UniProtKB/Swiss-Prot annotation:
Signal peptide per UniProt: none
Assigned GO CC terms: cytosol
InterPro entries: YaaA
Any GO BP: response to hydroperoxide
Name of the protein this chain belongs to: UPF0246 protein PP_1289
NCBIfam families named among the record's database cross-references: PRK02101.1-1 (NF002541), PRK02101.1-3 (NF002542)
Top-level lineage group: Bacteria
Similarity annotation: Belongs to the UPF0246 family.
C-alpha cells in the first residue's frame, strides 16, 4: 500500500534533521523547467499569481532565484522533515526511527506543485508553488496540465516496485486532482475524519488535516499494508465507523476533539 499526502506551505529549514540519510528528487528536469519559467516573474507578478503579500512574494522570488539543480544537505532538507503544518504536526516525523524512515521511503509520497512527487528522504530546496496555481506553461493553462499523467505514472511505478495496487489517499482535493485517475493502475482508498459538533459529525479542516498526518504515522509505524488494517486506527479518540464507511471510502469519527 502506498500513501499520498499534500505538502505544506510552512517550511522548517532551521531545525537540524534527525537523520543524516537522504535521497535526491527523481524528477528534477521537470522542476527545473518550472523554475526557469518562475524566474521570469517579478515579485509583483508572483504576488498576483499566488495571492501572496509583497513580503512573501519577495521571499519566493528570491527562492526561485537561488534554486539550483545541485542538491546538498547544505542547501536542502529531507522533504518529510522540511514540511510543517497541520498534517505534519500529526505525522511528527522528528520522532520516527531510522527503520520507520526506511519503511516510509518505500510507502509514502508527498505531492508537490514544483517537484511533482517526493519521497520522504528526498532533499528539497525551499519553495512555494501550490498545485492549484494557474501558471500557464508550454503544456497548458495550469500545473495540472503541466504534470499531466506523469504523477499517475510515477505512482504506478512506486506501487509496482512494492508489488501492490492499493493507493491510500490522504491528500487534499487540490493535490489529489493532480493524480489522473484514468492513468492510475490502482485501487484508491479515500478517508474522511469527522468530529462531533453541535450533535452532528462534520469534517473540520484543522482536525482532519492533523488526522491525515496521524494516520500516515500509524501506517508507517505499524507497517500497515491492507485497507482492512486501517480500520484499527484509533489515535486521539478517532474510531472506525462501519455504518458510514464504504469499501473504498473509510470514515472515522470522534466524539470529543482532543485539544
Amino acid at each position: 500500500m502506498l500513501t499520498v499526502i499534500s505538502p505544506a506551505k510552512t517550511l522548517d529549514y532551521d531545525t537540524p534533521p534527525v537523520t543524516e540519510r537522504f535521497t535526491l528528487p527523481q524528477y528534477l528536469d521537470e522542476s527545473q523547467a518550472l523554475i526557469q519559467q518562475l524566474r521570469e516573474l517579478s515579485p509583483a507578478q508572483i504576488s498576483e499569481l499566488m495571492h501572496l503579500s509583497d513580503k512573501l512574494a519577495g521571499l519566493n522570488a528570491a527562492r526561485f532565484g537561488s534554486w539550483t539543480p545541485d542538491f546538498t544537505p547544505a542547501n536542502a532538507k529531507q522533504a518529510l522533515l522540511a514540511f510543517k503544518g497541520d498534517v505534519y504536526t500529526g505525522l511528527d516525523a522528528e520522532s520516527l526511527s531510522e527503520d520507520d524512515f526506511s519503511y516510509a521511503q518505500g510507502h509514502l509520497r508527498m505531492l508537490s506543485g514544483l517537484y511533482g512527487l517526493l519521497r520522504p528522504l528526498d532533499l528539497m530546496q525551499p519553495y512555494r508553488l501550490e498545485m492549484g496555481t494557474k501558471l500557464a506553461n508550454a503544456r497548458g493553462k495550469d500545473l495540472y496540465a503541466f504534470w499531466g499523467t506523469r504523477i499517475s505514472e510515477w505512482l504506478n511505478q512506486a506501487l509496482a516496485d512494492q508489488g501492490d495496487d492499493v493507493l491510500l489517499n490522504l491528500a487534499s482535493n487540490e493535490y489529489f486532482s493532480a493524480v489522473k485517475r484514468s492513468a492510475l493502475k490502482a485501487r484508491v482508498i479515500n478517508v474522511d475524519f469527522k468530529d462531533q459538533k453541535n450533535g452532528q459529525y462534520k469534517i473540520i479542516s484543522f482536525y482532519a488535516k492533523k488526522a491525515r498526518g496521524m494516520m500516515s504515522r500509524f501506517v508507517i509505524q505499524q507497517r500497515i499494508s491492507t485497507p482492512e488494517q486501517l480500520k484499527q486506527f484509533d489515535a486521539q479518540g478517532y474510531y472506525y465507523s462501519a455504518e458510514q464507511s464504504k469499501p473504498d471510502h473509510l470514515v472515522f469519527l470522534r466524539d470529543h476533539p482532543a485539544e
